[in-house]
Amino acid sequence: MTASAKPVSSVDSFFSATLAEADPEIAAAIRGELGRQRHEIELIASENIVSRAVLEAQGSVMTNKYAEGYPGARYYGGCEWVDVAENLAIDRAKKLFGANFANVQPNSGSQMNQAVFLALLQPGDTFMGLDLAAGGHLTHGSPVNMSGKWFKAAHYTVRRDDHLIDMDAVAKQAEEVKPKLIIAGGSAYSRPWDFKRFREIADSVGAYLLVDMAHFAGLVAGGVHASPVPYAHITTTTTHKSLRGPRGGLMLWNDEQFTKKFNSAIFPGLQGGPLMHVIAAKAVAFAEALRPEFKAYAKNVVENAKALAESLRAQGFDIVSGGTDNHLMLVDLRPKGLKGNVSEKALVRAAITCNKNGIPFDPEKPFVTSGLRLGTPAATTRGFGVAEFQQVGSLIAEVLNAIAQGPDGSAPLVEAAVKEKVKALTDRFPIYQ
């Protein structure tokens, strides 16, 4: 070593070592996941593929900064740049959804909904939400969730004949149970929501209206789905799914009287320091969603969902409610003699990723189910169009028809052949090159 040479210290290594050098096991897992995303068709309705810019923001030095409080009113010094990021996220969210107020700090969809309960209800209060078995969500009153344990959930459901929400039945139930809060929104409902009627029902019984648009927020932002913001007292959404941002939550409202309640419910009510690297990534995603090309994306998501549903219907599969008006659909597998869990595994072996899902009035247990939930946001992001989704429908049918004829829920030769077709298709639409 020469006199001018500087030995490599642990500090130098800490700031310069790549992930592969510092933790090869995690690096290998990430490479494996990237390979999976590149070579599988992602049909999980709650998943998407973020831009490289979102990844860069979320992996930035913003992760180092504690920033309890809100912009201009922090409990820590040195927050001038994270204030810039959070203010940009707030302003962009308000512009994107036409809301007067926004809170971008919720770490997740569950926490944003918990914050609404904390702000507006007392333990033991009655609220209404769509039954999980009919397409609702855990945080809308499932007995295994905090919302169902600490509050009295009165669930509305869908009709047995067409699997649509009966708004007259919702109104009658609201009059009977007198809820303090009514939730519209869900995780597996493929038809439009009548936000105006929900607000009228809420007003008639003196209830607040919460719209959880976590699944279809990107469609609202893109102008292909009605917006709940003018009708709801509070609108919540995740920032991933169809909105195509980082995993996190967002709260929107118009009436200033709620501002202190909702902001205080997030901090200090539920959270401490916000995840500033995620908030920076949210700001990036909101800016992307404000661009004209996002409107085209949202339009394509819906068109592709309709194409996939029709492709499956044409090949003898039942679609719950007969089709879809948004980004997702439920496939009723009972006419094929199949279960959701078996079908999910077979499709995964064929490099088509989806999830088993209960259907309305499903006789099977949640880990079995009689259905599959399919969604189009992720594959649309990578460039799939109507023709590709028609092909995807044929590939799904090829696998499911094959396992329906087999004795053990598998069809190795067909699954392998479909996997090769999937690779040929995904190779035409590469990601993160």
UniProtKB/Swiss-Prot annotation:
It is found in: Cytoplasm. PROSITE patterns: SHMT. Gene3D superfamilies: Aspartate Aminotransferase, domain 1, Type I PLP-dependent aspartate aminotransferase-like (Major domain). CDD domains: SHMT (cd00378). Pathway: One-carbon metabolism; tetrahydrofolate interconversion; Amino-acid biosynthesis; glycine biosynthesis; glycine from L-serine: step 1/1. The modification N6-(pyridoxal phosphate)lysine is found at K241. Its cofactor is pyridoxal 5'-phosphate. It comes from the Bacteria. (6S)-5,6,7,8-tetrahydrofolate binds at L132, G136, H137, L138. The record marks H240 as: Plays an important role in substrate specificity. Keywords: Amino-acid biosynthesis, Cytoplasm, One-carbon metabolism, Pyridoxal phosphate, Transferase. One of its GO terms (biological process) is tetrahydrofolate interconversion. It is an enzyme of class 2 (transferase). It holds the Pfam family SHMT. GO terms for molecular function: glycine hydroxymethyltransferase activity; pyridoxal phosphate binding. GO terms for cellular component: cytosol. Its EC number is 2.1.2.1. Catalyzes the reversible interconversion of serine and glycine with tetrahydrofolate (THF) serving as the one-carbon carrier. This reaction serves as the major source of one-carbon groups required for the biosynthesis of purines, thymidylate, methionine, and other important biomolecules. Also exhibits THF-independent aldolase activity toward beta-hydroxyamino acids, producing glycine and aldehydes, via a retro-aldol mechanism. PANTHER family: SERINE HYDROXYMETHYLTRANSFERASE (PTHR11680), SERINE HYDROXYMETHYLTRANSFERASE 1 (PTHR11680:SF35). Belongs to the SHMT family. NCBIfam families: PRK00011.1. Homodimer. This is Serine hydroxymethyltransferase. It comes from Bradyrhizobium sp. (strain ORS 278).
